[in-house]
Design a protein with these regions (language model features):
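Exposed beta-strand/loop interface patches that mediate assembly or binding
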Residues: 1-109
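Parallel beta-helix/beta-solenoid repeats that form elongated, surface-exposed shafts/blades used
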Residues: 85-139
């Protein structure tokens, strides 16, 4: 039974990405599977996203693959993880958006924290910027 599951889903490695089209395509390096499959590279694997969020995973990221009907030629990428970049120490209920450079927007019980990792912040195409706050502190 477990062998059959290995043919339906698996954790593989991202070895390339093309974000130029309507659907992001990944190059995936698959390790050998338990049913006699050899390790191989798959090109142009579609990656699915939740609406409103997008990213390009760093090379070497883990990717959860779903193989439709157990066919490795009919694979889609449904989730990615890059362990070295993942923020640690969040509490239950916290959320964060982050990138490989250390830029992070963290939402916690104490409030919203934005870290630009020493890089500039640019706001484009705004008709107005309103700060509805009692105090601004610059350090």
């Amino acid at each position: 039974m477990m062998r059959g599951f290995e043919n339906i889903a698996g954790i593989e490695s991202v070895s390339g990405a093309d974000d130029s089209g309507e659907v992001q395509k990944l190059q995936i390096t698959e390790k050998a599977a338990g049913s006699g499959f050899m390790a191989r590279v798959l090109d142009k694997v579609s990656r699915l996203f939740a609406f409103g969020f997008t990213s390009v995973p760093p090379l070497g990221s883990e990717v959860l693959m779903l193989r439709l009907g157990g066919d490795r030629n009919c694979s889609i990428a449904i989730s990615t993880n890059h362990r070295p970049s993942r923020p640690k120490g969040l509490q239950p209920g916290d959320s964060a958006m982050y990138d490989v450079r250390g830029i992070m927007i963290k939402m916690t019980a104490d409030g919203l924290e934005i870290s630009a990792a020493g890089l500039p912040i640019v706001i484009h195409n705004a008709s107005k910027l309103t700060l509805d706050i009692p105090e601004v502190e610059c350090t």
